[in-house]
Amino acid sequence: MVGGHAEELNFNLESPHKWSFEWGWNNESYSKSDIHFKGIDHQFTLHGVRATDTQKTLTPLSLFNTYLNPGKITIPQTNARIAYQINSDTAFALNLDHMKYVVSDSQTVSASGQYLQKNYQNSDKQYLSPAFMHYEHTDGLNVVSLEYEKKYPINHLPGNLKMQFFALLGAGIVIPKSNVTMTMLGQVRNDKFHLAGTNLDVAGGLEFDFSKEYFARTSYKVGRVHLSDVVTSARQDKASQKFNYQEASLTFGLRF
């Protein structure tokens, strides 16, 4: 009986559960970025622009009001992932990182180029505020990636604890819904989903197995986004930018 009980508890990943689904949340930090704007009456660049994410602080109230509220499913920064386990240590996955990117108001940056009758000279500065412009991807800096993952079991853990280290490579596309208000041009925002660029990333983390079916993962990711075709107004003005990011995430998953 003792041996049979031990065998029952000694689950591992050599099981018929080939597919898995995860859902969770993320936090980001972003590098500074040069943002290039172009349209029929403007062509200018804002240099070294700072941006942040918008994840809400986790409190008992926000946990149930925001994070676990089905009616506000897109308000937090979320992760969704479906993976196929080829064998015990290799998987392919389709991953969605629903991140948010907001250019910080009340910062002063260098500017070059021109808009309407305004010409920036060498070393001119521009104060960023809603009276000038507001720029964000908050209905999603949505990164859809294909991932290749390897797992490495961590041995000699106490009791029945099962833990693995994983590392992955990801590449994909970025489909933001950019909320850009070009106040100084009198233009309203486009406010539509649009294929705007590409993403490359690498990540690593720990996977905790509660059973054959249920698990949790913590991960740290670094990536680079190249947005070559951001739509900034209803008349289809454009912007482009590149930036690096770091992401920490917590997800919960089910194998099936």
Give residue spans per PLM region.
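Extracellular loop and loop/strand-boundary signature of outer-membrane beta-barrel proteins
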Residues: 65-68, 130-137, 184-193, 233-241
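Short glycine/proline- and aromatic-enriched beta-strand/turn motifs that initiate or cap beta-hairpins
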Residues: 5-84, 176-178, 249, 253-255
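Residues that define the transmembrane beta-barrel architecture of outer-membrane proteins
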Residues: 17, 74-78, 138-144, 163, ...
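Short loop/turn motifs that connect adjacent beta-strands in outer-membrane beta-barrel proteins
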Residues: 7-18, 88-89, 153-165, 210-216
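Outer-membrane beta-barrel translocator domains and adjoining extracellular loop/strand segments
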Residues: 34-40, 105-111, 177-187, 229-235
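Gram-negative (and chloroplast) outer-membrane scaffold detector with strong preference
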Residues: 81-181, 253
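Flexible, solvent-exposed coil segments and beta strand-coil junctions
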Residues: 55-63, 121-130, 179-187, 228-233
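Predominantly the C-terminal beta-signal and adjacent terminal strand-loop region
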Residues: 33-36, 44-45, 205-256
